Each structure stands twice: as structure tokens, then as C-alpha cells.
Amino acid sequence: MTETRTVTLHNGLTALLTEAGQGRPALVLHGGGGPATVAGIAEHLARTRHVLTPTHPGWNGTPRPDGPSGVAGLAAGYLRHLQDRGLRDVLVIGSSLGGWIAADMAVRDTGADTIGGLVLIDAVGVRIEGEPITDFFALDARGVAEHSYHDPDRFQVDPALVPADQLSFRQGNMTTMRAIAGDPYMHDPLLLDRLRDVRVPALLLWGESDRIVTPAYGAAYARAFADARFEVVPRAGHLPQIEQPAATLAAIDAYAARDVRRSG
């Protein structure tokens, strides 16, 4: 059974939350493209887990925060929501901007043991010397496809062919993303050094053809953790869960199985 409702987080933010499945909990966090970009992951995990998939405030036509919140506000709000519900050993998975939120949540979980596993998929959120994050806002439709996908011709979207309501959602999503992550651009200057304090093993999955944040960026991101594994997904770009879903889900399943054995 799938249920979607609006929840109010402890810091006053509201988010649309979809829940499905039963079992150990998992939180799946989308990036700038919205919840559709992680829908396949959520559906897969819901076969064996209780999966929570929020739509971040301001995405897909939902209300934007009135005041400043940023990624830190989302991370704090989601973590507190899990804690208030008594959820423990949560597998947290984040794609792109969602990976940044997930990483921020992990550094905040300093004793409650709420988070039991961490998977970052082509995440942003840190500054890596020599590996700048591509300015997504400066790209046209072709540029987005070329930087985001291994096979851009297959996935390029012509804005003229997008229905008006969906185009409005996309424009609103970009406005919200710019508001919460545009300055400093797509990173927290303090996050990289804090990752060494994360207490759970992390898996960082990266599309080999990602030109938004390159595999070299991802490898450096992984090295900042005390315990992390870095895996490259062949023939995929910034969204390997869309271009190579089978390989991406297999990597997540293998990581989760190791996590079960570790905690069992």
C-alpha cells in the first residue's frame, strides 16, 4: 500500500511524503529533477523495505519555504522526522542534490544511530579542488543532456514538447534549487571536512560519463569519509539509476546485504 501526505518538519518546513512497503526503513532523496528521478529506486526497495520518499519543499508545485532553509534545513528536518517517529537503522539514499542532503544528515547523526546505511549517487555538496561542479543553471537543453547522460541523444528533452504543467514544475524546481543551493554554488564549504565523522560505511555510486560532477570528484568525495566504497557505473552519467537501473540497483542491493550482515 502506498500513502502520500503532507508532513510538517520540526523546523516548520512542509514536505509531501510518500510511503510504501514494509520492513527495515529506507529514505530516498531526489535531486533537482524531482521525485521521478528516484521513483525506480523507491519502487524497488519497497518490495522488501518500508520506503519514505519526500518531495522537497518547492518541488513539483509544492509550497516553497517562506524563509531561509537551505540544504542544512532540509537535512535537519528529515533527520528529526525519522527520530521523532522512532525509526532506526535507516538506509538513506540520495541522488545529486539529494546526496548532499543525505551526507549532511549523516554528519548530524552523532549518537542517535538513526542512519544505518548511506548511499550517495553522483552527489553534489562539497568543494573538490580542481574538480568544479558544472554550472547547471547556465546550460541549455542540449547542454543539460550532454553533461548529464552517457547517451544524450536518447535522453535530451525538447522544452517545446513538454506539457505546460510539467514545464511549470521544472521551472519552479530550478528556481527552488537556485534559492537553496545557488550561493555558494551546490556545496557547503564546511561539509567535506565533517565527513570523516560519519559513523556508518558509505557507498558512493558514480556514472562514468557524469560531467556535472565527474568521477574524479566522486572519488575525492569518497576519500573524505572514514569508511566508504566508490563504485563507477559504466555507460551512465549523472543519473545512473535512469540510464543503467539494473546495475545501480544491484550495487545498492549488494551494499544493503553487507549492511544487514554487519548489523546482524
Task: Give each language-model segment a name.
Residues 52-93, 250:
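Active-site loop/oxyanion-hole signature of alpha/beta-hydrolase fold enzymes
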Residues 13-63:
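Conserved HGGG/HGGXW glycine-rich cap/lid loop of the alpha/beta-hydrolase fold
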Residues 209-213:
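Acidic catalytic loop of the alpha/beta-hydrolase fold
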Residues 100-107, 115-146:
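Flexible "cap/lid" loop of the alpha/beta hydrolase fold
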Residues 2-3, 164-193:
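Hydrophobic, aromatic-rich cap/lid helix
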Residues 41, 200, 214-223:
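Short alpha-helix in the alpha/beta-hydrolase fold that links the catalytic acid
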